[in-house]
Amino acid sequence: MTNDYSNLFLPYTLNNGVTVPNRLAVAPLTLYCQNPDGTVSDDERDFLKHHGEGFGLYVTGATLVDAGGQSFYGQARALSEADLPSLRERVEIVRSLGAIPIAQLFHGGILANPDFLPDRQPRGPSATPDGKASELTEAEIESLIQKFAYAAELCMKAGYAGVEVHGAGPFLLPQFVSEATNRRTDRWGGSLENRLRFPLAVLDAVIDVKEKAGRKDFIIGYRITPEQPGEKGITMKETLAAVSEITKRPIQYLHVSQQNFFHAVRRGADTSKSRMELIHDAVAGRSAVIGAGELVTGADFERAVTSGWTEFAAAGQSVMLNPDLARLVRAGRDDLIDRFRDESKNDSCHLPKVLWPWVPDKDGPAKLP
């Protein structure tokens, strides 16, 4: 039996006039398989060539903007012109799949891995209680803003169609937003307005790169995680205020990252409603919205897009497990979409062994290292 998901393959025109061929997006994936210097390895090349064909948008994950922000082994980077050949190769592969390539701009902040850092010292908005990370100085904050901008410039030069500012998860930008990790008493901390100052300054600097280049067609996105656990974690009320500020800027999309697309609000807003509904209402049509979170099959994507809470549906694990995912969705063959890693398909799946713990297998959910 097949299903009709043809509406997922209708084009969508962003607010800058760029038309995306369909409503499916590859979520940014940290691949852990680049070469140690961040250049394209054989494993990364093989993965990129065999995953994401037929998607509308393809966000390549966690592109490093500063050597002091590296959290993962290898990790794609946009630090200098020496990185252009690998950036260009990623662009060429993604375009060959028929997708629009977007580079996600990343800094790990206090979650940078000391083993990968020049001085073995992670830095963030505030020093951590255990002393493992130190507080960024005013000068370092200003420098990081410009490094995000320079990374965007390099990605533009490499041929990327746009960039996504990584303001989701537990990394640098949300570290500034969250009272749990930002205990500053200067203009970068305290009130929500002050805690949003750094992420918005980064976004403004990236937008400035686009405007100075006269590239109306260049896509700018921003990724958020709606809520954090803990007494001082980011609340839905704070997120809705942030969304309002972010989408006042001329961005093309807001990307919402969470465990499950349909999760209801935890606190800080109407808990009878989904986070996605409230966020989409707050965006109020100023940009597109991309939703992610346990979207695996065509039925999942269809339910997300027809909810009215998102313009695009993004997948990560399902893309890793199903090299031909978009083709299967277009054919309405949810019955052929794998939800778990099948060892008999390891070769045809083109999934580097380092990524196996990041996808569920028949014995249970992903076993993250």
Question: Model-found features: residue ranges?
Answer:
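Flavin-dependent oxidoreductase catalytic cores
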Residues: 1-369
